[in-house]
Amino acid sequence: METLSQDSLLECQICFNYYSPRRRPKLLDCKHTCCSVCLQQMRTSQKDVRCPWCRGITKLPPGFSVSQLPDDPEVLAVIAIPHTSEHTPVFIKLPSNGCYMLPLPISKERTLLPGDMGCRLLPGSQQKSLTVVTIPAEQQPLQGGAPPEAVEEEPDRRGVVKSSTWSGVCTVILVACVLVFLLGIVLHNMSCISKRFTVISCG
């Protein structure tokens, strides 16, 4: 239940959008909280802001904007805490011609945990391990030259590219052979049909 109440603290209970810099959690005089976008929409239709839950009125002086209402400190505290249960989905194209959603583990010290199993969502026996390599900023390819890790992994990449290219070539050759075989059958049948109507000479 704690997760549900914590999740409900993270989103506006009117529009069910998560709080963000654009949708700030604003505290009304009655101590209820909703996002600044919903409050702005309520303000356009009314002079004062009326709480949708208790109908309490929050008076705003003339020229006073909804953005000038105080932010809810409890909600800001919950938003500021990193949640270990949240993962950003990353799509990685694997050599097995599949695209899978992989939740990458997150740590406070390092962005990614190297050597962790990343492919937990693969079906059955198709589990594959994913090793994450953290490259220092000064060695990244955009800033000149390939990093040493990339140079070491280059033969592996070439092998994967060669094997996928070879399997593609084999597939094309196999399909071409099947089509030639079927064409031969069709032509043979057509020649047999045309022989039925020819006049056989006797003699």
UniProtKB/Swiss-Prot annotation:
> Know the name of this protein?
E3 ubiquitin-protein ligase RNF152
How does it get modified post-translation? Ubiquitinated. Autoubiquitinated in vitro, leading to its degradation by the proteasome.
- Enzyme Commission number(s) from the entry: 2.3.2.27
UniProt record similarity statement: Belongs to the RNF152 family.
Q: Where are the zinc fingers (RING-type)?
A: 12-55
Which keywords fit this entry according to its UniProt record?
Apoptosis, Lysosome, Membrane, Metal-binding, Transferase, Transmembrane, Transmembrane helix, Ubl conjugation, Ubl conjugation pathway, Zinc, Zinc-finger
This chain's source organism reads Mus musculus (Mouse)
Class of enzymatic activity (EC top level): transferase
CDD domains, from UniProt? Answer: RING-HC_RNF152 (cd16548)
